[in-house]
Every structure is written in C-alpha cells, then in structure tokens.
Amino acid sequence: MNFNKVLVLLAVIFAVFAGQTEAGWLKKIGKKIERVGQHTRDATIQTIGVAQQAANVAATLKG
C-alpha cells in the first residue's frame, strides 16, 4: 500500500519536472514519427494507383 503511494508521488514529481524541461528531444522524435507516417501514406497512395492501373489493364484485356 505504501509502495503505491510512493510510486504515485514519484510519478507526480516526474510529471512536474518533465513539463518544465525543453521538449527538444521529444519534438525530434515526433518529427521522425510524422515523417515515417507521411512516407507510409505516400507509398500507400502510389500502391493503390498502380493496383488500379493493373486492374484496368486486366479488365481491358478481358474484354
């Protein structure tokens, strides 16, 4: 029971100090994650376009 109280107290202290520090490292990580998401989105859009073209070719050949 006391361990939980100490753990909560440490979490609150950490949250207070973490909120006051510069978010430089967190911002860098966020930008990297955002860039990965953008690349994934772009690759998905390109793949869908290629698949649609392939389906059109197949439909044209089928008659």
UniProtKB/Swiss-Prot annotation:
Domain of life of the organism encoding this protein: Eukaryota
Gene Ontology CC terms: extracellular space
Ranges annotated as spanning the membrane: none
Proregion positions: 22-23
Cellular localisation: Secreted
Signal peptide coordinates: 1-21
InterPro entries: Cecropin, Cecropin_insect
Residue(s) carrying Lysine amide: 62
Similarity section: Belongs to the cecropin family.
Role of this protein: Cecropins have lytic and antibacterial activity against several Gram-positive and Gram-negative bacteria.
Organism (species): Ceratitis capitata (Mediterranean fruit fly)
Subcellular location, principal: secreted
PANTHER family: CECROPIN-A1-RELATED
Cross-referenced Pfam families: Cecropin
Identification of the protein by name: Cecropin-2
Gene name linked to the record: CEC2
GO BP of this protein: antibacterial humoral response; defense response to Gram-negative bacterium; defense response to Gram-positive bacterium; innate immune response
Keywords attached to this entry: Amidation, Antibiotic, Antimicrobial, Immunity, Innate immunity, Secreted, Signal
